[in-house]
């Protein structure tokens, strides 16, 4: 799998911002088929940083019903909490 297909986008939320400021972690939405080793290599090659560790959270699609008739499901996704080595930094919003 290509590195550009592994990292989908960075997650920008209140919790992700708190995690980034309090510890040396960044959060990404990643391809559901990617494993921790592939995610680590992708972050190191794309952002030129050293990665200390990767934690992964997978959310499966959930069934939903509207008005008792229309059924469907929510989107599933996979998030990666990437811990950077001491002294490393990724700034997504440089110059904004």
UniProtKB/Swiss-Prot annotation:
GO biological process, one term: translation
Keyword Nucleus applies: no
GO CC term (a single one): ribonucleoprotein complex
Top-rank lineage group of the source organism: Bacteria
MF annotations from Gene Ontology: rRNA binding; structural constituent of ribosome
Keyword annotations: Ribonucleoprotein, Ribosomal protein, RNA-binding, rRNA-binding
Matching Pfam families: Ribosomal_L23 (PF00276)
SUPFAM superfamilies according to UniProt: Ribosomal proteins S24e, L23 and L15e
Keyword Transferase annotated: no
Cystine pairings recorded for this chain: none
UniProt-listed NCBIfam families: PRK05738.1-3, PRK05738.2-4
Free-text function comment from the UniProt entry: One of the early assembly proteins it binds 23S rRNA. One of the proteins that surrounds the polypeptide exit tunnel on the outside of the ribosome. Forms the main docking site for trigger factor binding to the ribosome.
Subunit annotation: Part of the 50S ribosomal subunit. Contacts protein L29, and trigger factor when it is bound to the ribosome.
Family statement: Belongs to the universal ribosomal protein uL23 family.
Name of this protein: Large ribosomal subunit protein uL23
Organism from which the protein derives: Oleidesulfovibrio alaskensis (strain ATCC BAA-1058 / DSM 17464 / G20)
Lineage, highest ranks first: Bacteria, Pseudomonadati, Thermodesulfobacteriota, Desulfovibrionia, Desulfovibrionales
